[in-house]
Amino acid sequence: MSAILSTTSKSFLSRGSTRQCQNMQKALFALLNARHYSSASEQTLKERFAEIIPAKAEEIKKFKKEHGKTVIGEVLLEQAYGGMRGIKGLVWEGSVLDPEEGIRFRGRTIPEIQRELPKAEGSTEPLPEALFWLLLTGEIPTDAQVKALSADLAARSEIPEHVIQLLDSLPKDLHPMAQFSIAVTALESESKFAKAYAQGVSKKEYWSYTFEDSLDLLGKLPVIASKIYRNVFKDGKITSTDPNADYGKNLAQLLGYENKDFIDLMRLYLTIHSDHEGGNVSAHTTHLVGSALSSPYLSLAAGLNGLAGPLHGRANQEVLEWLFKLREEVKGDYSKETIEKYLWDTLNAGRVVPGYGHAVLRKTDPRYTAQREFALKHFPDYELFKLVSTIYEVAPGVLTKHGKTKNPWPNVDSHSGVLLQYYGLTEASFYTVLFGVARAIGVLPQLIIDRAVGAPIERPKSFSTEKYKELVKKIESKN
């Protein structure tokens, strides 16, 4: 029974044995009920993926054979020295980022995702697990399929005792993202892929074990994230996973929140932070490490370490710190004139305006827009939201006049912290952990696809500066 229970270990539950027994029974019932949903008339996610992947693998094989020698772009020297920005060199099936339009998940914009994906009863926000299904298969699941997937993820949420003890032993002043990466790495003990590979499983079966690891990991992430949050900022105790709740609701409740609107925020947050094509640090790192046939646990842990950087996922924490400093210095004067002066002072001091600009986007990030619309709906008069709104009115003009950015518009990090602050989740150093839970929803489907289509290990070519000089001299002498 332990393989299908969603309750976490007794060592950190605050409920008694009777409550735990009830949760065990609920988990069993929910999983059996989910299997009924899927077996009656609907395919499970694994069944559906197994059905469609042979044709996809053949499509890729044929495409490479017929067009493998086609030139798809050129590489400039400045790109080699500039973080490979803009170089076409990765395959990422789940999403594509358009500079003007923003992200599309399997061809769908964020507003389309918000309209079309299944939702929990009474909710207006899409279910993150429905997006996981879409990213993996390219198809929108039915309500019954999502309900079965929600129950499956809840049933996989139990955390090994050694991981709990490890988290409890970590110093509270260790950054939550470091703790998150440590815990995910420690879950390698549970890897079905690693065990199967050690036993010589056929390459054709790699994807199946990667799928199982990915769903196991996804099911455990809300518990790990919440345990870190409760250890560092609260009393260390968390409740158990609700076997009948969806992914976003379980995350909210494990963190200690029952507010209906906050639960909806978690659904939205996890959805829009999940995927942003494959070239960003966390997605690329997860894919890169996975290409060496490291398990999903080790691959995601590596991606989380990249996400923890201040130039990537930790930017939302830095935005909030900057907002607080701004608020303190302007002393309640949120006029456009005051904000504009503060922005110019920031830029003239050689600092950046956090939350503005993006490596690819050249318009307002639609993820920012989705969060802004949520705030307008739920708390239009909130002080911090009003401040962010004023900055939104002023900053693009200031940044354009400053002339040192290609994109003067806000990105996703410019808004997310304000939403969390409103609902009382004020510990900014934890925000990137939530980002990490969301990012798993985007990167794990690609790992499964990589193994299913036999993607090779990643190995680009590197040159030293001297070698590049030789190459440039040779090229220029021919022109």
From Swiss-Prot:
Reading the lineage from the top rank, the first entry is Eukaryota
Gene3D superfamilies xrefs: Citrate Synthase, domain 1, Cytochrome P450-Terp, domain 2
Give the chief site where it resides. mitochondrion
- UniProt keyword Mitochondrion, yes or no: yes
GO CC annotations on file: cytosol; mitochondrial intermembrane space; mitochondrial matrix; mitochondrion
Protein modification: Phosphorylation at Ser-462. Dephosphorylated at Ser-462 by PTC7.
Name where it's found. Answer: Mitochondrion matrix
Q: Does the keyword Transit peptide apply?
A: yes
Q: Which SUPFAM superfamilies match?
A: Citrate synthase
Which residues does the Swiss-Prot or TrEMBL record annotate as the active site?
H312, H358, D413
Q: What more does the entry say?
A: Citrate synthase is found in nearly all cells capable of oxidative metabolism.
For biological process, the GO terms are: acetyl-CoA catabolic process; carbohydrate metabolic process; citrate metabolic process; tricarboxylic acid cycle
Q: What is this protein called?
A: Citrate synthase, mitochondrial
Q: In which pathway does it act?
A: Carbohydrate metabolism; tricarboxylic acid cycle; isocitrate from oxaloacetate: step 1/2
User: Which segment is the transit peptide?
Assistant: 1-37
Task: Tell me what effect the entry lists for S462A.
Answer: Loss of phosphorylation. Greatly increases catalytic activity and promotes homodimerization
Which NCBIfam families does UniProt cross-reference here?
cit_synth_euk, PRK09569.1
Main EC class the enzyme belongs to: transferase
EC number(s) on record? 2.3.3.1
Molecular function (Gene Ontology), one example: citrate (Si)-synthase activity
What exactly does this protein do?
Specific citrate synthase with catalytic activity only with acetyl-CoA.
The effect of disrupting this gene, in the record's words, is: Decreased growth related to mitochondrial dysfunction.
Activity regulation text: Phosphorylation at Ser-462 inhibits catalytic activity. Dephosphorylation at Ser-462 by PTC7 enhances catalytic activity.
- Subunit and interaction comment: Monomer and homodimer. Exists as an inactive monomer when phosphorylated. Homodimerization is dependent on dephosphorylation of Ser-462 by PTC7 and is required for activity.
